[in-house]
Regions:
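Residue-level signature of transmembrane alpha-helical cores of multipass secondary-active transporters
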Residues: 11-19, 53, 93, 132, ...
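Interfacial helix-capping/hinge residues at the ends of transmembrane alpha-helices
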Residues: 30, 67-71, 108-109, 146, ...
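Alpha-helical transmembrane segments and their helix-entry boundary regions
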Residues: 8, 42, 155-159, 187-188
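Helix-loop interface residues and adjacent transmembrane-helix termini in multi-pass membrane transporters
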Residues: 24-27, 35-39, 73-76, 151-152, ...
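Small-residue-rich hydrophobic transmembrane alpha-helices
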Residues: 42-102, 139-157
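Short alpha-helical transmembrane segments in multi-pass integral membrane proteins
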Residues: 1-12, 70-137, 177-221
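Hydrophobic alpha-helical transmembrane bundles that constitute the permease/transmembrane domains
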Residues: 16, 20-28, 51-65, 102, ...
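Interfacial/gating helices of multi-pass transporter permease domains
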Residues: 33-53, 120-124, 184-185
């Protein structure tokens, strides 16, 4: 195998693994509530998960755009621009996330007008949504981080983060549901914990692997 092909595979394979793990967060939640005895729980998680899939898909440009521009700056060895791109993408992600939190009620109401869930599903999905929406800063901030890592030709860190998120989600959700007696709120809190665990892990790994770039820590127009 040519060195160039090997380099491409080293970047592509971890990204493939990361993408495979993305749907697992929602599937894990559905699997857990499926044992609670009522199909309404599954419906609530399905509705809530669908809403967040749409929301985060809309803002997927944070990851893809950051990846492309970072790879260009990294190829030019423009390290100040590389760092500025990280700061900009994470800042935009956090700003958008806080707007989503402020607008969570009209977003949820508008979505339910289109979906028309039953009253029981609506009540549980509302609880799930209003807990998980607080994970938006972690998710959108992580979009910026993972896009930046990939642009730096390091797709292993996003893979490690994705795997860790799923493991934390399984442990936290199972513990909250079966040990603490929670139901939909336990699954939502487990997802929330996993999201912030992934975001914090991304920050720690950035500091460990790229902390030397802090000397370029500035934002220019």
């Amino acid at each position: 195998m040519k060195p160039r092909d090997r380099q491409i595979l080293q970047i592509a394979l971890p990204s493939i693994v990361s993408n495979i793990t993305v749907p697992l967060l929602g599937l894990i939640d559905v699997a857990i509530v499926g044992h609670l005895g009522s199909p309404a729980y599954i419906g609530a998680i399905a509705v809530g998960g669908m809403l967040f899939n749409i929301i985060y898909w809309i803002f997927g440009f944070l990851r893809m755009g950051t990846s492309g521009m970072t790879s260009q700056a990294f190829g030019k060895r423009d390290l100040p621009e590389v760092v500025r791109l990280l700061l900009r993408s994470v800042s935009i992600g956090l700003a958008v996330a806080f707007c989503l939190i402020l607008l969570q009620t009209p977003i949820r109401q508008g979505a339910f007008l289109l979906i028309h869930p039953t009253d029981e599903v609506r009540e549980m999905a509302t609880l799930y949504f209003h807990i998980c929406i607080w994970g938006a800063p972690a998710m959108l901030g992580l979009y910026g981080l993972t896009g930046w890592f990939i642009g730096m030709q390091n797709s292993r860190i996003p893979m490690y983060i994705a795997i860790t998120q799923n493991v934390v989600n399984i442990i936290a959700s199972l513990g909250l549901v079966y040990l603490c007696g929670m139901k939909v709120e336990g699954v939502a809190l487990g997802t929330l914990i996993a999201q912030y665990a992934g975001f914090l892990m991304g920050i720690v790994l950035w500091m460990h692997n790229y902390g030397r770039l802090k000397r370029f820590w500035e934002i220019k127009n």
